[in-house]
Amino acid sequence: MIYSGTYTAIKADVPEFFMRKFIKLERIRANRESIQKKLNKKWLTCGIFTCVAAIAMIGSYRYISGIVKVSSNVNGKELPIYCVQTDEKKVALSFEAAWGNDDTQRILDILKEHNVHVTFFMTGGWVETYPDDVKAIYEAGHDLGNHSQNHKNMSQLSDEEKTQELMSVHEKVKELTGVKMQLFRPPYGDYDDAVVLNARENGYYPIQWDVDSLDWKDYGTDSILNTVLNHKALGNGSIILCHNGAKYTADALDALLDGLKEKGYQVVPISQLIYKENYHMDVTGRQIPDAK
């Protein structure tokens, strides 16, 4: 930029030729300053974009216990764990407990006979109604899982309501057993990105299933056995869905455990099947360990 006072003083003492040179140099300098300002602005914008991109990338990772890094984001979508990639012939059997307890003790007795431990996902209402059953499940060595307080469609709730649904039953189970649950299964298998992220932010691994026994349809014991044992998805790392309180589940359980054993599978709780750290997911919700 050329200041008028400077120009007047120079014009009085300097020949026209030099005056034109001076003005030209001043214009070049001013132009350089303008370009530099634009570049600085451009670099600032790029820097902000880079930071935002980095934050977005970090957003696709979740930290468990503030120590390890895991990825639950696949193609921009947050996924719960449907199954696990493993070379070991292990599967997890899970029971959802939301209504009734007529068959709870029978299920526990059959599991004990087979020396098998499983995972029970319990609603807050079920915990309140059957506290002795919760204690019996825990004392028998089974996983205690969170199935929400009121069995609502979690994707339709606000973040605050999601947290209340999780933490209300969390505190009830903790008070009864001392256990801080870490496994969460959304009611009806209903989830979206917000449900998965909310669960993780509250210290939970969101869990689905890849083998549905369809015991809730009440088709009979043979139907349950055929559905599970001949399911196309059944394999190493599968998570099997059953229900406490379904009409034929307890009747089918003994034969189901025998059938899984005959296929060479060891039944374990979900907590012993999933990876707690250093893993990522594929598009099917399969949990895959990171390469070492």
Model region roles, listed by residue range:
Residues 134-136, 160-162, 222-225, 282-286:
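Short low-complexity, flexible loop/linker segments enriched in glycine and/or proline
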Residues 139-143, 177-180, 231-233, 285-292:
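Structural recognition of alpha->loop->beta junctions
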Residues 1-93, 109-118, 236-292:
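Terminal accessory/targeting
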Residues 101-103, 152-180, 190-236, 248-252:
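Alpha-helical scaffold elements lining the catalytic groove of polysaccharide deacetylases
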Residues 98, 123-125, 149, 189, ...:
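Active-site beta-loop-alpha junctions enriched in small/polar residues
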Residues 66-157, 161-172, 181, 255, ...:
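Active-site beta->alpha N-cap acidic-glycine motif
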